[in-house]
Amino acid sequence: MRVPVRWVLWDVKDTLLKVRRSVGEQYCREAQQAGLQLSPAQVETAFRLAYKQKSQLLPNYGRAQGMDSQVWWTGLVRDTFGQCGVHDPALLDKLANNLYHNFCGPENWEVFSDSNSTLKSCTALGLKQGVVSNFDRRLEGILRGCGLLTHFSFIVTSEDARVAKPDPAIFSQALERCGVPASSVVHVGDHYVKDYLTSRSLGIRGYLLNRKDGQKTHLDIPPEHILQSLDELPARLQHNTD
């Protein structure tokens, strides 16, 4: 007998919302206000390299090393602008502080057109909803500013959980909050390993959101586990399709 769905867990970035402009553009806008003229493409390249290096050296915002996300992001901003020839410590700290707080605001985020309607539909089906995200502690404020926070009963961020996807332990923490068997829980996210495979490894009903090319990229996934739009989810949940 199929266990009915009781909860829906959500990834956030690139699932429910996305960065409104590229990181290179946003960093350059902040630098311009400080009198610097930099190329967005150059800053974007520098950011990607710095992010990769720092994520390998100090994964999950350096939580295992006793850091918090603001310290981690400050270091990343310094490294990014340093590659672009900006080395003034006071200026770098100012840029880092401004950018950290700027990304708390809804003006830097764009909610996908199918997010709000799908969240409302899940609530109408009697489902409770939560968040499992490799994000830092700013996420609650971002969701509030974007008008999404009220849909969720809880938020588990990797910073607060001290563990990040694809470690299944972050999903285990979310399941404890749900208080129901994993088979009664759905998870929706856009990353094949971090969201789909990891949630499925615990018995959660994982769905992979693949807005760009649907089934083409992941031929090993049953078609009924792939969403090309969040609009497809409510009907699948209503019929309890696995």
From Swiss-Prot:
GO terms for cellular component: nucleus. It comes from the Eukaryota. Pfam families: Hydrolase. NCBIfam families: DREG-2 (TIGR02252), HAD-SF-IA-v1 (TIGR01549). Belongs to the HAD-like hydrolase superfamily. This is Haloacid dehalogenase-like hydrolase domain-containing protein 3.
